[in-house]
Amino acid sequence: VQQEPATVAYQAGHATVAGSCCTDLKALFNEDFVLPRPVVSNDDGTVLNAYNGSLRAGDEINKLAANVSIGRDAAGVHYRSDGIDGLVVGEQQALTLLREASTLLNEDFDGFTLSLFDGSRVRITDGQIIYEH
């Protein structure tokens, strides 16, 4: 019998880090940027074919965060709720960091604008997080 480590599952640490890092990426890059010439592999992974849909940077960043979280679920390390809540905790940590960073800039700066994992949008400027409707 193999004993599992005496650590808690909730919330998933990898998902928390992924949520924080991906939130920072969405703040720093244009989420609406459409990736040029996307490709997809064939069924056995030996050939890359043109992908006919459009891929937005923000959607791909969100997918990256989700893949980190879900991968840990598939490994049996976490429950799905551990990962989902970990992403949100990481997102909140990143928003706090961005809020503080917005007060430290000497240059003229309109702030960070980004979408959250729930689809809502925020603007962060002068130490304030403004939720847009």
Please provide the spans of the model-predicted regions.
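Membrane-embedded catalytic cores of phosphoryl/pyrophosphoryl-handling enzymes
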Residues: 1-133
